[in-house]
Amino acid sequence: MPRKSQGAKKTVTEQFEVLVRDLAAELKKHYGARLVSAVVFGSVGRGSPHPDSDVDVLVVAEPLPDGRMPRVRDFAAVKNALAARLTRLAEEGIHTTLAPIFKTPAEVRRGSLLFLDMIDDGRVLFDRSGFWRDFIQDFQERLRRLGARKIITGDRWYWDLKPDYKVGEIFEI
């Protein structure tokens, strides 16, 4: 890989790496002891962001306010702390936004199909006591027992959660 000269412009991926590093620091600062886990996923988690990629981030914290909007208002401190960096990125042609998903540990344990995207593409920024690691390993094991498969077609994919599914059958992940 060619080296860049001093002062060379950072690549899109490098710019996102700096943003993610700063995001992790601001999450720790704002949520403090409430922060259980933080996981970046999607194109940024895969390490293949585009200039218009958003930063998908799962924030697991306890306690969290009830309801989405109070949680968004709580997260505003993190967003505000990163506002100058986001503005600089926009000036350089990287038009990104933060796209947080908020869950308590109990809500994570109840599960979500969203977590399928985090199996391969999730990048852990913070994980107190291995909460996320343990959860995602258990989730993967449940998928394995079902025979679930990730089907990749070109640059897209989908999950066949239970290949031997029979009409009317009820199953849990």
Could you say what each language-model-derived stretch is?
Residues 1-34, 45-52, 62-173:
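Catalytic core of pol beta-like nucleotidyltransferases
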Residues 34-40:
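Short, glycine- and small/hydrophobic-rich beta-strand elements in well-ordered beta-sheets
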Residues 42, 56:
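Conserved G/P- and acidic residue-centered "switch" motifs that form tight phosphate/ATP-binding loops
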Residues 57-61:
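Short beta-strand->loop micro-motif that forms the acidic, two-metal-ion catalytic signature
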